[in-house]
């Protein structure tokens, strides 16, 4: 599911898809079920999502992802 109904910000399918992809890729990296679910908690505004950005070497675009989290 791309859209989390708990998120109260702007619904933008492209942003949700981009944020969700980070969690999917992070899950594929570690293969731990809690990574995928925890990464998506609180509309991606959590430390696991930030750690996934680091682990996936997305440091150079972290601000772009964090602004997406603030929108949703």
Swiss-Prot record:
Database matches in Pfam families: Crust_neurohorm
| Gene Ontology CC | extracellular region
| Location in or out of the cell | Secreted
Q: Which residues carry this modification: Valine amide?
A: 72
Q: What keywords does the record list, in alphabetical order? A: Amidation, Carbohydrate metabolism, D-amino acid, Disulfide bond, Glucose metabolism, Hormone, Neuropeptide, Pyrrolidone carboxylic acid, Secreted
Instruction: Classify the main location.
Output: secreted
Name a single GO biological process: glucose metabolic process
Q: Which residues pair up as cystines?
A: 7-43, 23-39, 26-52
**Disulfide bond as UniProt keyword:** yes
Q: Which residues carry this modification: Pyrrolidone carboxylic acid?
A: 1
Q: Kindly list the positions at which D-phenylalanine occurs in this protein.
A: 3
Q: In which tissues is it expressed?
A: Produced by the medulla terminalis X-organ in the eyestalks and transported to the sinus gland where they are stored and released.
**Keyword Secreted part of the UniProt annotation:** yes
Function field: Hormone found in the sinus gland of isopods and decapods which controls the blood sugar level. Has a secretagogue action over the amylase released from the midgut gland. May act as a stress hormone and may be involved in the control of molting and reproduction.
Concerning its family, UniProt says: Belongs to the arthropod CHH/MIH/GIH/VIH hormone family.
**Name of this protein:** Crustacean hyperglycemic hormone
Record organism: Astacus astacus (Noble crayfish)
